[in-house]
Amino acid sequence: MQVNSSVAYGNGTLAQVIGDGAVIRRQLATLTQQAGDGLVSDTLSGLGAGAGGSLTLGSSLTAVQTWQTNAQTASGPMQTAQSALSQISDIASSFFAQTAALNGINATAIDTTAASARDALKQVAGLLNSKFGDVFVLAGGDSANAPVPNDIMVSGMVTGISAAVGNLGVAGAAATIGATLAAASSNAVGVSPFSAALSQPAAVLQGYRPAVQIGANERVPSGLLASANGDVASTGISTTGSYIRDVMRALATIGALSSGQATVVGFGALVQDTHTSLGDAISALNGDAGVMGNRQATLTARQQSLGDTATALQGQVSTINDVDMATTLSRLTATQTQLQASYQLLGTLRSLSLATILGG
């Protein structure tokens, strides 16, 4: 605003200059605030017609940034889960190969393989308890607690399978296979090696799977559970419906074998069932891991696209909320000069007015 510098000796001109000075001071205060924080206004009402657009764009930006963070946060736990599944698959594949050659001819090999299977079962339990930070990545909604909370070797599942295999000569292969399947399938307290949260039917457990929101109406599963399949169903005639339980069952069965059973009727049938079940479990496990890998790639790509969207929205918000700093600083300097001129003019007018009164 240009200050009216016309010189008149009446009180009207003096009042006008005082009013102009007040306007300039308000302008200076606004420009000083804008130069300090870079914002058009520190209140929504100060944005005038741009207030509605700022609110809408700000809400959209917050949502997009949240979805981007969700996608980024899911990456670490998913990678840890992938690593655990990959190692379990390798263990299962090793014993799949060993059971193909396991027979009653080489009794010593039976004891060696059994000891290795017991160690492998402990290793699998440890992998199921893999953590990313403080999160158990295969525990789903119960991520603060270990999926396999206790020593798996003393679980009812393992001791039950061991007892059934030990009774192979009396019960026969079919009954033994049925008993090991029942023990591995059980969610009963004291039998299931899994936590209470994960010792539930697979249909119930689907609600425990971790998922992340990456869009207004888009949630993507971001993990798997230790005790239940995710997207790929287990197949075959000898399965619990869970490839992890099937792997555990196989390792517990192999671990319970002994060289003294080499000539027992039903030994070959039990080993063959274990071999077949392991193969089916490996296929389902690798299938689920593959689906999760694809989702990881999807989340990575979405994270990038959400970042681009956030950048674009930030630019639009900035257009409304932020000042052009170079222009603001230039106006600030000019307004300071204008205010100084106003003070000088006011002083001159007051002196003239006083002189008029005294000389009147």
PLM regions and their residue ranges:
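Polar, low-complexity export/assembly segments characteristic of proteins
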Residues: 17, 21, 28, 32-35, ...
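Amphipathic alpha-helical polymerization modules
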Residues: 1-145, 259-360
